[in-house]
Amino acid sequence: MFAKWAVLCVLIVPLLPAQEDSMPGGPSGLRCEYLTDPVGIDVPQPRFSWVLEHAARGERQTAYQILVSLKPDLTDGGQWDSGKVSSGQSVHVVYAGKPLSSGQTYYWKVRYWDSGDRASPYSAVARFETGLFDAAEWIGKWIGGANQIRKEFTLAGRPVRARAYVAGLGYYELRINGRKVGDHVLDPAWTTYDKRVLYTVYDITERLRPGANAVGVMLGVGWFKARALRLQIHAEMEGGQTVDVATDGSWKTMPGPIQSDSVYNGEGYDARLETPGWDRAGFDDAHWKAASLTDGPKGALSAQMMPPIRVVDTIAPLKMTTPHPGVYIYDLGQNISGVVEMRVRGPRGTRVQLRHAELLYDDGTLNVENLRAAKATDVYYLRGDGSQEVYQPRFTYHGFRYVELTGYPGAPKFDTLRAKVVHSDVRPTGGFTSSKQILNQIQRNIVWGIQDNLHSVPTDCNQRDERMGWMADAHLYAETAMLNFDMPAFYTNFLRDIHDVQAADGTVTDTVPHRYGSRPADPAWGMAYPLLTWYMYEYYGDRRILEQHFDGVKAWTDYLRTRSRDGILDYSYYGDWVPIEKTPGNLVSTFCYYWSADLVSRMAGILGKGGEAESYRKQADEIKTAFNAKFLNPATGVYGTGTQTAQILPLFLNMVPGDRRGGVLGSLRDDLVYTRNTHLTTGILGTKYLFPLLTETGNSDLAYELATQTTYPSWGYMVENGATTLWELWQNKTGPSMNSHNHPMFGSLGAWFYNALAGINLDTAKPGFERVVIAPQVVRDLKWAAGSLDTIRGTVASSWSRSDNGLRLEVTIPVGSQAEVRIPELGLEPVTLSESGRAIWKDGKYQSGPAGVTGARESDGTLVVEVGSGKYAFAMASE
């Protein structure tokens, strides 16, 4: 997968400005509710987004027209013809046509008019399909039984259209007429089952045939810790007849070859118990038992509108060793989430065992101590019919780099095992690379660590007896995830998960779904609710998310107020987790309380709730005053006990009184550089906010030195000690305590690579990258850096390289967006700046000329250039 991600990060080839009479191209990248051609959405008024295409610079959309129809050729907009709508909006356009029906496929296309009122061609036709809007439309009943369930049915002919609606808990695999349907694994996504159960819609038209058909479902316990199935098939026949098949007491069930399955402990599979043909018509199920009707979970059925978990890559081992006779250790060379596919041939009943771990002992044997109670072991009993047998677990996953193979009949080969990388299939959308190899490896480790921990919820780790949606981890690496992957549908679902656990008193929980940890959440953990809501608005311009979760975020903030005393929030469980130096918990909690109130005020202002915006602004100001009175030492001029985090947090949110800011910042800088020899002592919160703070205050060189540090504690120290993902602790620990070696909560650094080193930043005043700020930090010995990001509006990219006499910067801005490009003068004077060979700054003045460039000015050693959409190649040099 990393290779796929890496190709996204390329140096931009500058293009000459397009001719002014260039015509607009047809829109691309059509999305419905963030998804491409989704099958099964249950939003009555879905939103449409598209990417504008235009060869000319400085272009924008002035109007659009959307057609929606039941006809795939879209000869008319029978469902909705928006007409020509004068608007620059190309994201989150709300459907406003005839009411949508359940279980229906709709086709849509869009065109737009550019700044010259020239119409583009229509886009290619996209589609979306609705799920079931009304609970009464579910005719299938919840049934239970053993882990294999089947049903046969007859069709008079071949259907013209057929769909399966499936909710299977904890996990399921759907099979029709002997073959698996779809490529999802570990489906459905984990939710709070008492509130919400997700179902998936499958197009099974080509799987059904005239005559007898069979549907089979394998069930695993997953996070539900039981097995339950609700399914219905709706087939439309020629002539308009319909056939419905739904779960009820007539379905048959029998235990299958999966003898045990556990997320933590692994899977036990006895191939001797396979019953060939059980998922085909004509199978003799006379000895199978009738499935039992059950109440099922209490939660409402909801469409799974997010990227599913899939096998996204296959990795061959790097090497195989034999530390003891009969014990074979395979090294993948990379810490992953997933399972192993094994090929084996041998006597019937032979027991083969696969154990998984992140670490080895010095003697080369498997070290499973840090897995704690998780056994992470898959066991396979051979069928023994003389053929080659292939085994891959279905209802578990592991976090591992090493696999121990024992009990194998004969001598295994190098290719006996292959690893399958398994996680939520979020599309890579970003890339970063630079001239500094340690940064590139850290970026690689961050990307692997995040993707390994996206398993329908953002987890803390992927290997031990935990793997929870810890809320602090979720919000701390969220921005990095958004810069590297296509995350909006994933986080939309997770915000619903948070809403599902919220109690009437406003409290949320440390983990979501809630299986472990406290209620109420630690304030720093509860920050996931306001921050993820806010990030969805900033990165994707999603106002509907603000509308949906404003009351919930406000309720959480109101709860914090009930726990505060004179503006100070004293309760704290974790605070700035896993630091080198501990910061007082009440300082961290009060910081979070202030930020929650501040965000509620900002959200209220955006939503037109002026009274609440003013009220929560006043509340935030009162908290800030109390914070400074409590924690700022007037004698020493530092906060709390003087830790780095205690200074970082108030500096980051501009809570420090103006006359004290310089002193607090100076104390922080002195501690970093002199006291700690350019090392940090922060935990996960302080680390997240340190790097943007240093950049904002003109200390990017120091941030770079910290980021490239290779001695303890640092990311480079992890790399130097063989890490291929991020550790839970700064220390390199391998014992049975808290020491995961795949824990992305320190991955917040990755956002700084994009924001500072590549210089790609959003402007909250124009969210969703409608306005972009390109501000690369040209630091120390870094010779070049490049970053690219597929935003909801199109590609934003920035690539720079420097020489002794200047700087080259290449920039891409999406059609419909504008940008402020900040080019550091690097102490050169006087400077000239050209774009595609034409001067735009000379003799201290802006020189008009190139298309798309609308102005330039000089500010504090930086040339600030205003541009519209397009690709630009800037060259700065000394005159």
Where are these regions (language model features)?
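Active-site acid/base region of carbohydrate-active enzymes
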Residues: 171, 230, 248-250, 254, ...
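Alpha-helical support elements that line or immediately flank enzyme active sites
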Residues: 162-166, 176, 339-358, 392-395, ...
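Extracellular/oxidizing-compartment recognition motifs
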Residues: 20-105, 109-464, 472-473, 489-490, ...
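Bacterial N-terminal signal peptides
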Residues: 4-14
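Active/binding-pocket-proximal capping segment
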Residues: 172, 180-183, 187-188, 498, ...
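Non-catalytic C-terminal accessory modules of carbohydrate-active enzymes
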Residues: 232-234, 246-277, 304-313, 701-879
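C-terminal capping/lid segments that line or modulate ligand- or cofactor-binding pockets
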Residues: 269-270, 465-466, 471, 484, ...
